[in-house]
């Protein structure tokens, strides 16, 4: 007797969209409060001065300034926002 198995369905063919993680504002870029600096899983980068960290480990700016990346102790990388010194107002001509 010739038999042919019923055609099954493939168990492959599914994938999820990328999560768009990574650095969003690089060192030297200007930021304002609320700007997302890094989206990450876990704490690859740790928060430094003038930045906060969300429950999903997103690092965001808390004040206006310039992004700075630096290496700390124990191999940790820190992200800070450096607030520029207040510039004196230019005198009108």
Curated annotation (Swiss-Prot):
<dbReference type="GO" id="GO:0003735">
    <property type="term" value="F:structural constituent of ribosome"/>
</dbReference>
<dbReference type="GO" id="GO:0006412">
    <property type="term" value="P:translation"/>
</dbReference>
<dbReference type="InterPro" id="IPR001684">
    <property type="entry name" value="Ribosomal_bL27"/>
</dbReference>
<feature type="region of interest" description="Disordered">
    <location>
        <begin position="1"/>
        <end position="22"/>
    </location>
</feature>
<protein>
    <recommendedName>
        <fullName>Large ribosomal subunit protein bL27</fullName>
    </recommendedName>
</protein>
<dbReference type="Pfam" id="PF01016">
    <property type="entry name" value="Ribosomal_L27"/>
</dbReference>
<dbReference type="GO" id="GO:0022625">
    <property type="term" value="C:cytosolic large ribosomal subunit"/>
</dbReference>
<keyword id="KW-0689">Ribosomal protein</keyword>
<keyword id="KW-0687">Ribonucleoprotein</keyword>
<dbReference type="InterPro" id="IPR018261">
    <property type="entry name" value="Ribosomal_bL27_CS"/>
</dbReference>
<comment type="similarity">
    <text>Belongs to the bacterial ribosomal protein bL27 family.</text>
</comment>
